[in-house]
Each structure stands twice: as structure tokens, then as C-alpha cells.
């Protein structure tokens, strides 16, 4: 899969689905998009390096 350096271009729903697809546990409740962007960077973008 192609992990983005700048995940903020994705929609919040897309971010959430990408995280779930990669077995990342999402925080409870509805979060701001930045929260998911941060998780994406920590878990997915980091894997690519």
C-alpha cells in the first residue's frame, strides 16, 4: 500500500478507514481530523521508512 507523507490531504473518513485497515486502534468517540492525521503519521508513514 502507498502511505502518504502528507495524510492531511485525505478526508477524515478515509484516514479512519486506512487506520482501521492497518490494525491501528482509533480513539473513542469522534475526534478532530488532526488526531487521525497524527495517528497516520505515527503508524503508517513511519512504516514506510
Swiss-Prot record:
The keyword Secreted appears for this protein: no
SUPFAM superfamilies (alphabetical): LEM domain
Annotated Pfam families: Thymopoietin
Cross-referenced Gene3D superfamilies: 1.10.720.40
GO molecular function, a single term: hormone activity
LEM-like domain span: 4-47
Domain of life: Eukaryota
Keywords recorded for this protein, A-Z: Hormone
Region annotation Essential for biological activity: where it falls in the sequence: 32-36
Family: Belongs to the thymopoietin family.
Its job: Hormone of the spleen with pleiotropic actions on prothymocytes, mature T-cells, the nicotinic acetylcholine receptor, and pituitary corticotrophs.
Stated name of the protein: Splenin
Organism: Bos taurus
Amino acid at each position: 500500500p502507498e502511505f502518504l507523507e502528507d495524510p492531511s490531504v485525505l478526508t477524515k473518513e478515509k484516514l479512519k478507514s486506512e487506520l482501521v485497515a492497518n490494525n491501528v486502534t482509533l480513539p473513542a468517540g469522534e475526534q478532530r481530523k488532526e488526531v487521525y492525521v497524527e495517528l497516520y503519521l505515527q503508524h503508517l508513514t513511519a512504516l514506510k521508512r
